[in-house]
Amino acid sequence: MSNPAVLFLQDVLQEPKLIDWEWIGENFWEDIVPAVQGHIFLSFVSVAVALVIALPVGVLSARYRKVYPPVTFVTGILYSIPSLALFAILISIPGVAIGPAPVIIALVAYSLLILIRNTVAGLDSVPPETIDAARGMGLTNRQILFRVELPLALPVIVAGIRIATVTIIGIATIGAYINGGGLGQLIFDGISRQFPTMIITGAVLATALAIIADLLLLALERYLRPWARARRT
């Protein structure tokens, strides 16, 4: 008996009309735009929640080095769990239903390692003489952190946000498997209906979102490095 996936692939390759523009036009506002909005919502909320957790943990890890190894160990384990397995674990927890909530929890878990590492790396990149100069001016440790260290570390932190955002946008497509919504819904619906237009539309738009987010955050990262711009000019 032939494999259904192989038969579907053969049908796709033999079908000259991979993109049904009429379907896209008819379903643009009803299906495609809400899917894009849902994907942006999942990604934005996940990055925001992850930042709220990662920034203080990263600062704590930079200040107290004994904290850093166990933090990276735990977040590294979370990062290494396959996405479908993590989704399955989350929805098996009592009180956690399928939908956007477990998807956001999983996406936050995946981005913590990247954000914490970059926060620590950014704070480590601040020259010690700069901190000594700030302390000599009478600034407290809290003032040094918020007025000196974090502003100088911001480009490295934004680089971590950039990597985490692109990662989240990609993994969020799989969240549709547990009714998380987003562009993954188009992809999974297209697979179930054997309708290539939905699959391609979801995949192309998810890729476009990742590229746009990457370029915007790259521009922000370069803007926050005025010394690098000065060297280029």
Regions found by a protein language model. Give the residues of each.
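Loop-to-helix entry region at the N-terminal start of transmembrane alpha-helices
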Residues: D31-L42, I91-I114, L154, M198, ...
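Transmembrane alpha-helices
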Residues: F44, R142-I174, T201
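Membrane-embedded alpha-helices of multi-pass transport/permease systems
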Residues: V52-V57, P102-I105, A109-I131, L154, ...
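Cytoplasmic-entry segments and transmembrane alpha-helices of multi-pass inner-membrane transporters
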Residues: V57-L90, L107, R117-A121
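Short helix-to-coil transition segments within interhelical loops
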Residues: L123-A153
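Hydrophobic alpha-helical transmembrane segments of polytopic membrane proteins
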Residues: L183-L220
